[in-house]
């Protein structure tokens, strides 16, 4: 697995909902995002109860499900895009459990996925999932929020792989309530100075530069998915707008 050190060029991770509006669009969009400067892609696995996501991504999940999304769609998209862009699956445990988590990890590895982001796996119950990920050379991405105590941070930070998903506040994606992060960032850096910290939840084209100051990268989801949901736009216009947003954010966090 690729090894990351402290980063000089700040990274951009983009979240998009898989197969919305369809597989072919997602494949084309992912490849276009790579060309627009996106470093990693969170490929969202549609689920009916996405507890960590705000109303924008929740709506996108439901739309994709209504259009008949299946895990086979996820596999076909991933196979096409993973050679061109670092690909992570972001999903909830239920769809993966239906297949079997061991089988999910094996499939992810075979398709070139680099990591899994599963918000509803409590840290206390994550050991068997971590083991399966390790066996398949996948990173199980860890979340750290301002609400975590020092002892929990001291446990999570040393075992994190690929990057730590730094939660900007305790809540759902796409909302705006924030917590002061500098003390938390300093605490994590003291424990594991090599692991990149990527800030997510509430990052958009207006605030990305400010939010990225103390971290190694940002994760942008709702700001992009909002464009996916805009029924006034054609698919071509959606792709152009999303890629322009991504390019603008990547430039702003590195300016």
Curated annotation (Swiss-Prot):
Keyword field contains Iron: no
Keywords: Amino-acid biosynthesis, Aromatic amino acid biosynthesis, Lyase, Tryptophan biosynthesis
Pathway in which this enzyme or protein is active: Amino-acid biosynthesis; L-tryptophan biosynthesis; L-tryptophan from chorismate: step 5/5
A cellular component annotation (GO) from this entry: cytosol
Gene3D superfamilies membership: Aldolase class I (3.20.20.70)
GO molecular function: tryptophan synthase activity
InterPro entries: Aldolase_TIM, RibuloseP-bd_barrel, Trp_synthase_alpha_AS, Trp_synthase_suA
One Pfam entry name: Trp_syntA
Known EC number: 4.2.1.20
Active site positions, chain numbering: 42 (proton acceptor), 53 (proton acceptor)
Reaction catalyzed: (1S,2R)-1-C-(indol-3-yl)glycerol 3-phosphate + L-serine = D-glyceraldehyde 3-phosphate + L-tryptophan + H2O
NCBIfam families associated with the record: trpA
Family: Belongs to the TrpA family.
Function: The alpha subunit is responsible for the aldol cleavage of indoleglycerol phosphate to indole and glyceraldehyde 3-phosphate.
Self-association and partners: Tetramer of two alpha and two beta chains.
Name of this protein: Tryptophan synthase alpha chain
């Amino acid at each position: 697995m690729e090894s990351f050190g402290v980063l000089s060029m700040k990274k951009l991770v983009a979240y998009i909902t898989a197969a919305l509006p369809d597989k072919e669009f997602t494949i084309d969009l992912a490849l276009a995002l790579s060309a627009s400067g996106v470093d990693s892609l969170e490929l969202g696995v549609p689920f009916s109860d996405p507890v960590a996501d705000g109303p924008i991504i929740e709506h996108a999940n439901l739309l994709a499900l209504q259009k008949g999304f299946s895990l086979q769609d996820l596999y076909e998209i991933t196979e096409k895009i993973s050679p061109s862009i670092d690909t992570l699956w972001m999903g909830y445990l239920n769809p993966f459990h239906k297949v079997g988590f061991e089988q999910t990890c094996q499939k992810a590895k075979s398709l070139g996925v680099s990591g899994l982001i599963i918000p509803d796996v409590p840290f206390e119950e994550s050991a068997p999932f971590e083991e399966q990920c390790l066996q398949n050379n996948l990173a199980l991405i860890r979340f750290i929020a301002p609400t975590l105590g020092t002892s929990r941070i001291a446990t999570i930070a040393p075992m994190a792989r690929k990057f730590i998903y730094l939660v900007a506040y305790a809540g759902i994606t796409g909302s705006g309530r924030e917590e002061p992060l500098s003390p938390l960032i300093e605490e994590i850096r003291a424990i594991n100075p090599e692991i990149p910290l990527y800030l997510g939840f509430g990052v958009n084209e207006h605030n990305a530069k400010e939010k990225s100051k103390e971290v190694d990268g940002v994760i942008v989801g709702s700001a992009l998915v909002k464009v996916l949901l805009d029924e006034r736009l054609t698919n071509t216009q959606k792709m152009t707008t999303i890629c322009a947003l991504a390019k603008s954010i990547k430039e702003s966090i590195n300016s």
